Swiss-Prot record:
GO molecular function, one term: structural constituent of ribosome
Example of a GO cellular component annotation carried by this entry: cytosolic large ribosomal subunit
Species of origin: Jannaschia sp. (strain CCS1)
Pfam families: Ribosomal_L35p
Taxonomic lineage from the root: Bacteria, Pseudomonadati, Pseudomonadota, Alphaproteobacteria, Rhodobacterales
The UniProt record lists the keyword Thylakoid: no
InterPro entries per UniProt: Ribosomal_bL35, Ribosomal_bL35-like, Ribosomal_bL35_CS, Ribosomal_bL35_sf
GO BP annotations, alphabetical order: translation
Phosphoprotein recorded as keyword: no
The protein's name: Large ribosomal subunit protein bL35
Keywords: Ribonucleoprotein, Ribosomal protein
Cross-referenced PANTHER family: 54S RIBOSOMAL PROTEIN BL35M (PTHR33343), LARGE RIBOSOMAL SUBUNIT PROTEIN BL35M (PTHR33343:SF1)
Family: Belongs to the bacterial ribosomal protein bL35 family.
Length: 66
């Protein structure tokens, strides 16, 4: 049986930690930051953990990052 392929779009956007959590960057930061509050900009830095249902979907895209 051939090897399963990893979705290229997923490997660019998500990171799986050693404990199995899926981390992703905050959405909505491409443009229009002038009207955002400072609190939003501060909280949007870095990455955040995906919810359990979303993590399950993302992990199916990356069969070797578990």
């Amino acid at each position: 049986m051939p090897k399963m392929k990893t979705k290229s779009s997923a490997k660019k956007r998500f990171k799986v930690t050693s404990t199995g959590k899926v981390m992703a960057a905050q959405a909505g930061k491409q443009h229009g930051m002038i009207k955002r509050s400072n609190k939003f900009l501060r909280n949007a830095r870095g990455t955040s953990e995906l919810s359990a249902p979303d993590s399950k979907i993302v992990k199916s895209y990356m069969p070797y990052d578990r």
